[in-house]
A protein has these predicted regions:
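Conserved ATP-dependent adenylate/AMP-binding module captured primarily in the ANL superfamily
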Residues: 141-177, 209, 250-269, 302-319
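Conserved AMP-binding/adenylate-forming core of the ANL superfamily
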Residues: 71-122, 142-152, 200-205, 242-245, ...
Length: 627
C-alpha cells in the first residue's frame, strides 16, 4: 500500500487569510543529473541521531513523565480508560517476559487479529520489549471476509507462535478455522469452542525474568520489530519487514520535519488502523517518540461511524489531526453546523495531515474557511509521499506550498532517485527507513530494488518548476496503473482519476479507469452515498443499487461527466462512457483494502463483464454515455 496522495489538477483555492505559524523543517535538496536522464535528490540537512530501539523512548518518557497519559480509549461507552507511560513500561516488561518464555521469534511471531485498543498496544509493546516481531492484521480478514482467503494465506506465510484477538467470541470462527492446534490463542476475554485461550491478564501477570534487561539490551537496529501487510496486484499479502532502525529513523525524520512536535507533546484523536503504516507506524510512533497522548477513536468516516468521531472531538482538542480525505469530508458538515465542536477542534490545532488519496479543493477550502471563522487564521494542511516499505515517511510538503497532489521533497535521511520511464519520472528511495525486504519472499524482494539499492515505489513524480526542483514535486500517478489506448497513446491513470473524482464531487468517491488497447477511455464509478443524498435526500443510507438507478443521481452525474468531457485535452483524458457500480468492491478479491484504497488492476480483472458492457456497440441502459 502506498500512502501517497493522488494528483489533482485543481489547485487549492486562494485565501488572503494568514496561515497559523508553526515550527517546520523545510526540506532542501542537492541535485545531481546523470547523462542517462536519471536525477538524484539528496537532502542538504543530514539526519540526526536516532535510538537503537523504539522502547528507548518508552524508557525516556516513563522516567521523565511517568504519569502522563500515553493512550486512552472509551470504556463502557462513557469515560476513558487511560494508561500512563509508567504503566505501559511495566506492562511491557511483564508481557515481554511471558513471550520470551514461549520461545517466540521471527520464525514464530505474534499475530494480532483485532483492531486498535489499549490491550493491542500492550501486547505490541511487550513484543517490542522482547525483541519478538508482531504483525497486526486487518480485522476485515477475520470479520468481513467470507472465505478467510487472505487470513489463511498469511498464517502460512508467517507461521505464528501466538495469535491474539481482544474479543475471542467475536473472532472465534476465524480463530478456529485458521489457527492450527499447536499454536497458542490469546485474548482479553471470550472463548473459542474446543480451544484453550490464554488471557492477556495472565500474560501481564508473568513474573519479570531475571535476564530481561539483558535480552532487551541485545535488540539492535536490524532486529525485526514487526511485519506490516501490504497487497500487490495479485491481492495476496506481502509481509513488509519493519526493523527497529526503520521505525526509529523515521520518527526522527518526522520530528525534524514536523518540528512543532518539539514545541509541546502532541495530543492525537485517531481512528486510523494500526495494520496500516499510517496509523500503526506514523501516528502511534509519533505519539510515543514525542511523549504525546493518543485518544483512540472507535469511529470511522462512514454512516453510523462518524458520530463517534464527533463525540470524541467534542471532548478532546487535538494538537495535530491525521485523517484520510474521506474522514475530513465526513467531518465537515458537523464542523460547519456545530460551533461548540468547531471551537474544540480548532482550539489548539497546529496542523492537519492527510494521506491515501487526494483531498478535494472543496473540502480543503471549507476547512480553511471554518478555521478562519473560528480562529482568524488557516491551519496548515500537510501531506507527503510514503509507503509501507518506507516506514512510511519519505517526502513532505511545507505548509506554505501545500496543496492536493503536491508531495514536496525528500526529508533528511532519504535520497530520492528519479528514473525516466515512458515519458514520466519514476521515483525510488534509499534511506535507513527503507525495508530490507519482504518476509520469506526473496524473489519479490529482489525485483523491488534497483542495482544501486534504491527501493522502487512504483510512483511517478513531476517537478512543480522544471528549472527549480527545490520547488518540490507533484504526484504523477502509479507507473503500473498507466496504460496505452489502441492508438498507442498513454493514459496517465493517477492524475486522470483525481481530476474525475474532483469534477464529479460530491457524487463520486473513487473511479476505476478502463481502456487498455481500446479506442477511448471509460470509467467504472464508485458512488459516494453521502454525496448522493445531497442530490436526493430521500435515498436510503446504504442501498447502492437504489442510488445507481436513481434518476436525480444519474442526471447529476451525467451533467458532471459532460462538463468533464468538455475540459478534455485529448484522447487520453476523454471519458465518454461510465457505469455506476451497484455492488461493493470486494476485500476477498483484493479489489479494495479495509481503509478504502482501490486496486485498479484487480477491479478491472474481476469486473471484466462490466468492461465489455462499457464498450458494447449497443450499450445497455446502465451505461451513461456523453459526447
Amino acid at each position: 500500500m502506498s500512502a501517497q496522495p493522488s494528483s489533482s489538477s485543481m489547485e487549492r483555492g486562494a485565501s488572503t487569510s494568514p496561515l497559523r505559524p508553526i515550527s517546520f523543517g523545510d526540506p532542501v535538496v542537492n541535485i545531481e543529473r546523470r547523462d542517462d536522464g536519471t536525477i538524484y535528490l539528496r537532502p542538504k540537512q543530514p539526519l540526526g541521531d536516532y535510538p537503537v530501539r523504539i522502547t528507548d523512548r518508552l524508557h525516556h518518557w516513563a522516567t521523565t513523565t511517568p504519569d502522563r497519559v500515553f493512550m486512552a480509549e472509551r470504556e463502557g461507552g462513557r469515560g476513558w480508560r487511560k494508561i500512563s507511560y509508567a504503566e505501559l513500561l511495566a506492562a511491557s516488561r511483564h508481557i515481554a517476559s511471558g513471550l520470551i518464555a514461549r520461545g517466540l521469534s521471527a520464525e514464530r511471531p505474534v499475530v494480532i487479529l483485532s483492531g486498535n485498543s489499549i490491550d493491542h498496544a500492550l501486547l505490541a509493546f511487550g513484543a517490542h520489549y522482547a525483541g519478538i516481531p508482531f504483525c497486526p492484521v486487518s480485522p476485515a480478514y477475520s470479520l468481513v471476509s467470507k472465505d478467510y482467503g487472505k487470513l489463511s494465506y498469511l498464517m502460512k506465510l508467517l507461521t505464528p507462535g501466538l495469535v491474539f484477538a481482544e474479543d475471542a467470541d467475536k473472532f472465534a470462527d476465524a480463530l478456529a478455522a485458521n489457527v492450527s492446534l499447536g499454536t497458542e490463542i490469546a485474548a482479553s476475554y471470550g472463548h473459542v469452542p474446543g480451544r484453550d485461550v490464554t488471557s492477556l491478564a495472565d500474560l501481564m501477570a508473568t513474573p519479570i525474568r531475571g535476564d530481561l534487561d539483558e535480552v532487551h539490551g541485545k535488540i539492535g537496529p536490524d532486529t525485526i520489530a514487526k511485519f506490516l501487510l501490504t497487497s500487490g496486484s495479485t491481492g495476496n499479502p506481502k509481509a513488509v519487514i519493519n526493523t527497529q532502525r526503520m521505525i526509529c529513523a523515521n520518527q526522527v525524520m518526522l520530528r525534524e520535519t514536523l518540528a512543532f512536535l518539539k514545541d509541546e507533546p502532541p495530543v492525537i484523536v485517531d481512528w486510523l488502523p494500526w495494520n496500516h503504516t499510517f496509523g500503526g507506524n506514523h501516528n502511534i510512533g509519533l505519539t510515543l517518540y514525542n511523549g504525546g497522548s493518543m485518544y483512540l477513536d472507535a469511529g470511522k468516516p462512514v454512516p453510523g461511524g462518524i458520530e463517534e468521531t464527533v463525540r470524541n472531538l467534542q471532548e478532546i482538542s487535538p494538537t495535530v489531526y491525521f485523517n484520510v480525505p474521506k474522514g475530513y469530508e465526513s467531518l465537515l458538515p458537523y464542523l460547519r453546523d456545530d460551533q461548540g465542536l468547531r471551537a474544540k477542534f480548532f482550539d489548539r490545532l497546529h496542523a492537519m495531515f492527510f494521506s491515501g488519496a487526494a483531498l478535494s479543493p472543496f473540502v480543503w477550502n471549507s476547512l480553511d474557511e471554518l478555521a478562519v471563522k473560528e480562529k482568524g487564521y488557516r491551519v496548515p494542511m500537510l501531506t507527503g509521499l510514503g509507503a509501507t516499505e518506507t516506514a512510511p515517511f519519505f517526502m513532505s510538503v511545507n505548509p506554505r506550498t501545500s496543496r492536493s497532489g503536491h508531495v514536496g521533497l525528500p526529508v533528511s535521511g532519504n535520497d530520492a532517485k528519479l528514473v525516466p520511464n515512458n515519458g514520466k519520472m519514476e521515483v525510488r528511495c534509499k534511506g535507513p527507513n527503507v525495508m530490507p525486504g519482504y518476509w520469506r519472499q526473496p524473489d519479490i524482494t529482489a525485483k523491488s530494488f534497483d542495482e544501486e539499492g534504491f527501493y522502487k515505489l512504483g510512483d511517478a513524480l513531476k517537478p512543480v518548476d522544471p528549472d527549480d526542483f527545490n520547488a518540490g514535486f507533484d504526484f504523477d500517478g502509479r507507473i503500473g496503473e498507466d496504460f496505452k489506448l489502441g492508438s498507442g497513446t498513454w493514459v496517465s491513470v493517477g492524475p486522470l482519476r483525481a481530476r474525475f473524482v474532483a469534477a464529479c464531487a460530491p457524487l463520486v468517491r473513487d473511479v476505476v479507469i478502463a481502456g487498455i488497447n481500446r479506442d477511448e477511455v471509460s470509467a467504472l464509478v464508485v458512488l459516494d452515498l453521502d454525496g448522493c443524498r445531497l442530490i436526493n435526500p430521500t435515498l436510503p443510507a446504504d442501498d447502492l443499487v437504489v442510488a445507481t438507478r436513481d434518476r436525480l443521481v444519474r442526471e447529476a452525474f451525467r451533467e458532471r461527466l459532460t462538463r468533464f468531457l468538455g475540459a478534455a485535452t485529448g484522447s487520453s483524458t476523454r471519458i465518454t462512457r461510465a457505469i455506476l457500480m451497484d455492488t461493493p468492491l470486494s476485500i476477498d478479491k483484493g479489489e479494495v483494502t479495509d481503509k478504502g484504497s482501490i486496486n485498479q488492476r484487480a477491479v478491472l480483472e474481476h469486473r471484466s463483464l462490466l468492461i465489455e458492457e462499457l464498450y458494447a456497440a449497443n450499450p445497455s441502459d446502465r451505461v451513461i454515455s456523453v459526447g
